[in-house]
Amino acid sequence: MFVSRLAASGLLLLALLAVSLDGKPVQQWSHKGWPPRPQIPPLVVQQWSQKPWPPGHHIPPVVVQEWPPGHHIPPLVVQQWSQKKWPPGHHIPPLVVQKWDPPPISPPLLKPHESPAGGTTALREELSLGPEAALDTPPAGPDVGPRGSKAPAAPHRLPKSKGASATSAASRPMRDLRTDGKQARQNWGRMMNPDHHAVGGGGGGGGARRLKGLAKKRVGDGCFGLKLDRIGSMSGLGC
């Protein structure tokens, strides 16, 4: 009995609700009765507005928007060329060619043997001759003979044979230079020690006795085969 009363009251409420509405929902939610919707911006503007850019900032071209974040953006010239905004007739190479285009090759520098000046050419000829050209030139200074004579010494030339003979011939100019230096030292010794040079064979000083002893031992004949005087043998300036 209690359950039947509840069911009857529920049915009564539903009937009253249907009578109170009576077609009002159809009139209220019809197509003309929709509230005005807000203007939806394009998708590009929506994506740009989500970035932390200040309001009113210029929106970049579509090419820049299509590049993923962190990717290298091509130069503006390539972007304009891809959008066909470049003036006609102007050739722009592809991006790969721009990246891998080698730098212009500079003209090679002039080498020393290719220089127009004549000084380097003469120097190159002297170097190409080798040590033979240097040995053929006689040493500078007064020419002194093998035993101190004033006769000019014959120039020494390097023989064509190889081995020990070539080495000895190459050392002859150095021996001539040593001979010239020895003569200069002897002259300097005579100027510095005139007393020793003027001492005779019968003096009683220590210098005279030393000269007699050296004369007996024949020390004055042994400096590169050249004869030495008393000044050189006593003072050691001869060799």
UniProtKB/Swiss-Prot annotation:
GO biological process, one term: receptor guanylyl cyclase signaling pathway
Protein name per its UniProtKB record: Bradykinin-potentiating and C-type natriuretic peptides
Keywords from the UniProt entry: Cleavage on pair of basic residues, Disulfide bond, Hypotensive agent, Metalloenzyme inhibitor, Metalloprotease inhibitor, Protease inhibitor, Pyrrolidone carboxylic acid, Secreted, Signal, Toxin, Vasoactive, Vasodilator
Organism: Lachesis muta muta
PANTHER family per the UniProt record, alphabetical: C-TYPE NATRIURETIC PEPTIDE
One function term, GO molecular function aspect: peptidase inhibitor activity
Record Pfam families: ANP
Pyrrolidone carboxylic acid: residues carrying this PTM: 50, 65, 83, 98
InterPro entries: Natr_peptide, Natr_peptide_CS
Organism phylogeny: Eukaryota, Metazoa, Chordata, Craniata, Vertebrata
Cellular location(s): Secreted
